[in-house]
Amino acid sequence: MSRVKRGVTARARHKKVLNQAKGYYGARSRVYRVAKQAVIKAGQYAYRDRKVKKRTFRSLWIVRINAAARQHDISYSQLINGLNKADVELDRKALAELAVYNKDAFAAVVEKAKAALA
């Protein structure tokens, strides 16, 4: 069996990591050992923040819905309660879109919720 030197493989692996670390500051983009750590940490942050993004957007939608609902003299929790009682199955993302871009439709939804609460 012939001997296999690892030069080509190692260079390819190093190049892959250094390409992933492009744009990083200082040694993090130039030195393999440091770049590898930076890339691993970046991956951990990316994985975590894909989960956090969902929470962040949900809270943003709730803030927007609450602000729009209060303009119609109803709180967010009352609005959601009214929509549940009226069997309106609009999710928070859709409600927030209506609240921002289609105020007339949102007003109609609010009236439906108020009617269910009365």
Curated annotation (Swiss-Prot):
Protein role: Binds directly to 23S ribosomal RNA and is necessary for the in vitro assembly process of the 50S ribosomal subunit. It is not involved in the protein synthesizing functions of that subunit.
GO MF term set: rRNA binding; structural constituent of ribosome
Gene3D superfamilies on file: 6.10.160.10, Ribosomal protein L20
Cellular component, GO, one term: ribonucleoprotein complex
Protein's name in the database: Large ribosomal subunit protein bL20
Similarity section: Belongs to the bacterial ribosomal protein bL20 family.
CDD domains documented for this protein: Ribosomal_L20
Keywords carried by this UniProt record: Ribonucleoprotein, Ribosomal protein, RNA-binding, rRNA-binding
GO biological process, one term: translation
Keyword rRNA-binding included in the entry's annotation: yes
InterPro entries per the UniProt record, alphabetical: Ribosomal_bL20, RIBOSOMAL_L20_CS, Ribosomal_protein_bL20_C
